[in-house]
């Protein structure tokens, strides 16, 4: 995804390695892919991410957000954390839209969503998640990432100090 989105700059002057563990404890799969990608964009750009949203979803090379397993457990787990810390009305979970048809949640979570005190944001593309987590239009965030990568490139070439 990074190469496809930012390759017009030439060779990327940053090396990013993401390892998607396929099994960790009782959870399996690449469901942290979207969250990890957002963290990388934040690290490169220096832009902060919202801290009141949990994120789950796999990502393909074109930026599509793919379905993952055990979404109900993840949503309900984050809901319990938010409930314990105090619901603010802004908290929620970003999840793949493809998971919605089969998502079954406990009644208290459904009620919190219906009351607007907890939110579910179903996304199909990385840019939708970018806008939710950065609070800015995706094109603007991508421009900040490009600027940072161009700066890295100039540093690497000795053009800037």
Q: Model-flagged regions — what are they?
A:
Residues 1-161:
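Peripheral, non-AAA+ core regions of ATP-driven protein-machinery
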């Amino acid at each position: 995804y990074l190469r496809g989105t930012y390759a017009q700059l030439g060779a990327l002057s940053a090396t990013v390695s993401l390892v998607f563990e396929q099994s960790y404890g009782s959870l399996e799969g690449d469901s942290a892919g979207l969250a990890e990608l957002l963290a990388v964009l934040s690290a490169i750009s220096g832009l902060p991410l919202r801290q009141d949203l949990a994120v789950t979803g796999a990502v393909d090379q074109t930026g599509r957000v793919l379905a993952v397993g055990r979404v109900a457990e993840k949503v309900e787990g984050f809901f319990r954390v938010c409930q314990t810390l105090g619901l603010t009305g802004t908290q929620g979970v970003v999840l793949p839209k493809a998971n919605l048809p089969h998502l079954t949640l406990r009644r208290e979570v459904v009620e919190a969503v219906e009351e607007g005190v907890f939110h579910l944001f179903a996304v199909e593309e990385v840019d939708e998640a970018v806008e939710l987590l950065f609070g800015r239009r995706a094109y603007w965030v991508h421009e900040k990432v490009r600027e940072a990568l161009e700066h890295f490139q100039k540093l690497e070439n000795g053009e800037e100090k």
